[in-house]
Regions:
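Non-catalytic C-terminal accessory region of glycerolipid acyltransferases
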Residues: 62-65, 103-105, 130, 170-305
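Catalytic core of membrane glycerolipid acyltransferases/transacylases, capturing the structured
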Residues: 107-167, 191-197
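Conserved beta-strand termini and adjacent loop/short-helix elements that scaffold enzyme active sites
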Residues: 98, 139-141, 164-167, 241-243, ...
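Amphipathic coiled-coil/heptad-repeat helices and related helical stalk/stem segments
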Residues: 97, 121, 148, 165-169, ...
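Hydrophobic (often cysteine-bearing) scaffold residues that line and stabilize catalytic clefts
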Residues: 60, 144, 148, 255
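A conditional alpha-helix N-cap/helix-loop micro-motif detector
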Residues: 91-94, 118, 145, 165-166, ...
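A broad structural signal for alpha-helix termini and local helix breaks/kinks
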Residues: 17, 36-37, 51-53, 132, ...
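Membrane-anchoring hydrophobic helices of lipid-metabolizing enzymes
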Residues: 1-115, 150-155, 160, 304-305
């Protein structure tokens, strides 16, 4: 009941305001975040220190402040996403090199679009079906709050994206007849330390979701990394990087290593725009990592090679 009241009486009406006015309110919230209400400050500082040990404390604090500024911008833009028009969204969210996806579509090649929680990923989800010729697909886990899960997915899907539960991903792919582009944010902390792919990421041993590589090989889909760049406040551009259009030609781990490396390069270029408040490194590195990797590689090769 409270969620519905908050949505209909506060959040959705606020989304109808001009974005410039919404930024005025989130600017005030930014001042609260860096002073009175330090949201996950310990997590942010720990992540920055471990990721950039070569930077001085002053440099990391500068990134931290810029991150919180960006985070409050995302609050305004996230609210705006509930009501933003197709025309306005297309004006604010552009693709630098759409020919990458256009060529894959001509080949009737479905695509896994892979990146991380960098810049405004929510606008990417909402606008994807407007940007590329492929049918947009999003994979996600339902939110614990049923009302918000329904409302957010309605907003995300209103321009044509199909939202599917992660548990039915394989059923969906097996039955699918469309040329699709499935968006995957692969920088989330994995649910199981023993089932993910371990590599080096931002100066730390990191467990990475292996799902994109498995899906690419299982269903012979191309893999494209997308980098969302902040042009200016409220405006973004996307640069596409094709990793492969033939995953069977690559060896175990190559796809995962490549999209992880590309995300790291993206973050290092403009560190403040990644989601530093996320507990990315909460999983412990397995003690038998070498044996585990050997076992995973063997199973992968038996299945796909």
């Amino acid at each position: 009941m409270f969620s519905a009241l908050a949505y209909y009486l506060l959040i959705y009406p606020a989304s109808l305001l001009p974005l410039r006015l919404m930024y005025f309110f989130t600017d005030f919230f930014y001042l609260l975040l860096i002073s009175i209400l330090p949201y996950r400050r310990k997590v942010v500082r720990k992540n920055l220190k471990n990721s950039f040990p070569e930077k001085s404390e002053k440099e990391r604090r500068k990134i931290e402040r810029k991150f919180y500024r960006h985070l409050t911008d995302l609050l305004a833009e996230g609210a705006k996403n509930l009501s933003i028009s197709k025309k306005n969204l297309k004006k604010r969210f552009r693709v630098e090199n759409p020919e990458v996806m256009e060529e894959l579509y001509k080949k009737k090649k479905s695509v896994l679009l892979v990146s991380g929680h960098y810049n405004n990923w929510e606008w990417m989800i909402t606008s994807q079906n407007l940007l590329f010729p492929h049918q947009a697909v999003g994979i996600g886990m339902p939110l614990s709050n049923g009302f918000w899960d329904k409302k957010l997915n309605e907003r995300r899907a209103r321009f044509g994206m199909k939202i599917i539960h992660s548990k039915i991903t394989h059923d969906f792919f097996k039955k699918n007849k469309d040329i699709i582009a499935t968006l995957v944010l692969a920088d989330q902390s994995p649910g199981d330390s023993n089932r993910c792919y371990w590599t080096s990421f931002l100066n730390q041993k990191t467990g990475v979701l292996f799902g994109p590589e498995m899906l690419a090989n299982e269903y012979d889909q191309a893999v494209v990394y997308f980098n969302i760049k902040k042009v200016r406040r409220g405006y973004y551009s996307i640069h596409l990087h094709e990793i492969t259009d033939n995953p069977s030609q690559l060896t175990y781990g190559q796809i995962t290593e490549k999209h992880t490396q590309l995300l790291e390069e993206t973050i290092k270029e403009e560190p403040a725009f990644w989601l530093w408040s996320h507990k990315r490194w909460k999983r412990q590195v397995p003690e038998n990592l070498d044996a585990l990797r050997e076992s995973h590689e063997k199973k992968f090769n038996e299945r796909f090679r």
